[in-house]
């Protein structure tokens, strides 16, 4: 995967890690149709490339991570998003694209509106001290129904309502976002946050790809099921892994004091 320096999405492969950078810094890294298509293609490539174990997404520049939709560039009327179902119209975040691999979001600056999708839909979120959050939908007469619903999983109803109902009248600090659990880790600067994400990615890359994929599915499912339902679903995922070579390779490598040789094929059987 590659992209020109002028592309709205920069893609770099660093060993087993794909680094995606929203590249419209002069426009707040806002989302355009071209960028949305590039994101969808990138997520699908990441999920289907066995050499990629983990992905990082961040924004270019020093001020913004992502300020949401570039409204003037998005067709909302007849023949556009208005006539599309949710799954067809929303295919740009890792969760929307059903990415089975771990995704780390590095929030390097202000995030508003649609940019919150990446925060809500990533597996691990690393913020920096200037990474404030806003949701200005209602201030411009729009409904906050998607990003805010995703934030409920991370921070609860109160935090999501505070952002959604106050609109541009409330700006959540990065420290507050960390305290609420929206950010999993908080670093002083954007550079520090990206370095931390790369360190996490290196650790993640050493693990069994299939075990991580099933663990991720089980944990995300717990946000959608009742407690008994989540346990039953998790049990079935756990049992399905027993037939995979990594189930045997992990303990064997540990006993032999060597680095495991993981099998990236989810359909492999021992």
Show which residues each predicted segment covers:
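An acidic, glycine-rich surface segment that forms the CoA-thioester-binding/catalytic face
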Residues: 36-38, 44-48, 71-112, 145-155, ...
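Conserved CoA-thioester-binding segment of acyl-CoA-metabolizing enzymes
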Residues: 1-58, 62, 270
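Crotonase-fold acyl-CoA enzyme core
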Residues: 97-209, 258
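Amphipathic alpha-helical segments at domain termini/boundaries
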Residues: 1-23, 164, 169-205, 213-224, ...
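Short, active-site-adjacent cap segments at secondary-structure transitions
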Residues: 62-66, 112, 134, 219
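Short loop-to-helix capping motifs
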Residues: 24-25, 49, 207, 244, ...
């Amino acid at each position: 995967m590659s992209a020109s320096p002028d592309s709205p999405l920069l893609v770099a492969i660093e060993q087993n890690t794909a680094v995606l950078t929203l590249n419209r810094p002069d426009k707040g890294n806002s989302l355009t149709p071209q960028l949305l298509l590039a994101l969808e293609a990138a997520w699908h490539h990441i999920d289907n490339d066995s050499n990629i174990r983990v992905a990082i997404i961040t924004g270019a520049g020093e001020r913004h991570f992502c300020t949401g939709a570039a409204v003037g560039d998005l067709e909302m009327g007849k023949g556009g998003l208005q006539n599309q179902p949710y799954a067809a119209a929303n295919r740009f975040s890792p969760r929307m694209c059903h990415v089975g691999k771990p995704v780390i979001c590095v929030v390097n600056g202000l995030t508003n509106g649609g940019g919150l999708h990446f925060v809500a839909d990533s597996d691990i979120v690393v913020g920096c001290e200037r990474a404030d959050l806003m949701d200005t939908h209602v201030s411009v007469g729009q409904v906050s129904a998607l990003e805010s619903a995703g934030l409920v999983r991370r921070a609860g109803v109160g935090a999501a309502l505070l952002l959604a109902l106050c609109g541009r009248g409330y700006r959540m600090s990065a420290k507050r976002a960390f305290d609420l659990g929206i950010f999993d880790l908080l670093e002083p600067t954007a550079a520090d946050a990206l370095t931390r994400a790369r360190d996490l990615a290196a650790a993640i890359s050493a693990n069994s790809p299939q075990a991580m994929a099933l663990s991720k599915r089980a944990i995300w499912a717990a946000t959608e099921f009742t407690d008994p339902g989540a346990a039953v679903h998790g049990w079935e995922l756990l049992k399905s892994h027993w037939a995979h070579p990594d189930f045997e390779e992990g303990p064997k490598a540990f006993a032999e004091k060597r680095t495991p040789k993981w099998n990236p094929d989810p359909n492999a059987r021992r």
